[in-house]
Amino acid sequence: MPSTTFDHLPTAKQDRVTAALLTEFSAHSLADAQVARIVASADIARGAFYKYFDNLTDAYQYLYHVALREIHRDAGGDERTTFDAERIYQGVVDFVDQVNDSQYYAFIRRHYAENESLLPAAPVSSRLPAIAWAAMVLSHAAIKEILLEPTSEATVRERLRTTLALLQQKED
């Protein structure tokens, strides 16, 4: 994640760096990304990049968190703890719609297609109930499939809704 130096930059400069990251990581995989293109686009010194981020992976993860925070906010993310199949289904639909309509579409699509496997797996709490874990895994798989193969969206959505309903029956 970014350093405190980055956090204390004027908002306009943070936005410029973030926009340069989005341009780079939307056009190039993490493996092919270059600091040189980022610093040229952001109009910052190469040394400044390394004051803001440890490396390209750190910068990528920062941008990924920014994108998810914005997309989840616009998709109306819900943090309820009770299992509700329809709410989870609608959250996936809203998330996909927000990604499709956002500046992050190419970045998120490339994340699933090329970059996800290059990053460390996010830890999942061992206290997460099995049904919540199943819904989470299923939802993320559905999002990935829809974004990578948009023509399959209707089929994936129906399969997701059906499976979540089965999980709901198990929960009730």
Question: What are the functions of these language-model segments?
Answer:
Residues 43-53:
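Short hydrophobic/aromatic patch on the recognition helix
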Residues 1-24, 37:
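Basic, helix-initiating cap at the start of DNA-binding domains
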Residues 76-101:
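Hydrophobic alpha-helical connector segments
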Residues 122-172:
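Hydrophobic/aromatic-rich alpha-helical bundle segments in the mid-to-C-terminal region
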Residues 16, 53, 57-70, 106-115:
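Alpha-helical DNA-contacting segments of helix-turn-helix folds
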Residues 75-79, 106, 146-150:
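Secondary-structure edge/capping motif, primarily at the C-terminal ends of alpha-helices
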Residues 12, 19-23, 27, 41, ...:
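Alpha-helical structural segments
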Residues 31-37:
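Ser/Thr-centered, proline-biased regulatory motifs
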